[in-house]
């Protein structure tokens, strides 16, 4: 029994680099961020789920097609996307939640903005590949 407990604890203590599923998911999110900073339809299509629901911090909600269009036609451009915190959890097989906060600089329809954003994202394993399924975010006001 003691050996089983020690084995279980050693698996739970593995860093991300030694946890293959967490490493795959981190790589998928890194690819998503890279695609948002230098967008092409192909890069975005590869990482976004067909059923994407993307709720921006201003309340606007996009589908996959709407998000890809706004990023590739220049309506929205991101120049900074820097995580302060990014945590993954696996509540069910094939589902991952990602929570945290990041600093962003963007220009949306000609209006420049710089903010700190809090978020909850959902990733789903689709045909063996992690796909970005949902995003909900809110602006975090500066400390007073």
Region spans (language model):
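A beta-strand edge to alpha-helix "cap/lid" segment located at domain peripheries
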Residues: 17-46, 51-144
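Positively charged n-region of N-terminal signal peptides that target proteins for export
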Residues: 1-4
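Hydrophobic h-region of N-terminal signal peptides that target proteins for export
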Residues: 9-17
